[in-house]
Amino acid sequence: MAKTYDYLFKLLLIGDSGVGKTCLLFRFSEDAFNTTFISTIGIDFKIRTIELDGKKIKLQIWDTAGQERFRTITTAYYRGAMGIMLVYDITNEKSFDNIKNWIRNIEEHASSDVERMILGNKCDMNDKRQVSKERGEKLAIDYGIKFLEASAKSSMNVEEAFFTLARDIMTKLNRKMNDSNSSGAGGPVKITENRSKKTSFFRCLLL
């Protein structure tokens, strides 16, 4: 049976329990939002195929449990991940502080060249905000990681986040292919950014 996609990207959602990883996954994969909190047991995944620059990309997105007792299970899935989204809750300061610990886990268990993004979820709850957007941006700059605020509930920036991570993986793959074929003729077609800006992040505001 012929493949229906050009690339398969394995993505990982990590972060403390309750920050909204599962809600982000459901919003992106099924455009749905569940108001009932159900803690992920171990690990789960969803699949969505997107199109970038004329290529069909199958995203296999793994949703990991944030509880400490599942840490040994979830770290096994770091291997082979091409992109990792570190999620915190803007209304929960501790979940933001723990992002540094999650980054340490990535450095210990994931590939050294994995693409990463820090995502501040629940920005629709601005009245309960404990973590400013500026603090999120600064942390991302300190680690050289992209940053975005999003809301699984309102869907604000959810598509943007996953597409940006996928595009960064695609760009890296393309660069590697070009490097490996630079000495020969008829190398792969260069995939270029359609947007003039590196990324076009939107501010999350309550209207």
From Swiss-Prot:
Domain topic, free-text comment: Switch 1, switch 2 and the interswitch regions are characteristic of Rab GTPases and mediate the interactions with Rab downstream effectors. The switch regions undergo conformational changes upon nucleotide binding which drives interaction with specific sets of effector proteins, with most effectors only binding to GTP-bound Rab.
Cellular compartment(s): Cell membrane; Cytoplasmic vesicle, Phagosome membrane; Endosome membrane
Cofactor(s) annotated in UniProt: Mg(2+)
Lipid tethering residues (S-geranylgeranyl cysteine): C204
Positions of modified residues (Phosphoserine): S180, S183
Enzyme Commission number: 3.6.5.2
Entry protein name: Ras-related protein Rab-8B
Function: The small GTPases Rab are key regulators of intracellular membrane trafficking, from the formation of transport vesicles to their fusion with membranes. Rabs cycle between an inactive GDP-bound form and an active GTP-bound form that is able to recruit to membranes different sets of downstream effectors directly responsible for vesicle formation, movement, tethering and fusion. RAB8B may be involved in polarized vesicular trafficking and neurotransmitter release. May participate in cell junction dynamics in Sertoli cells.
Binding site for GTP: 17-23, 35, 39-40, 66, 121-122, 124, 152-153
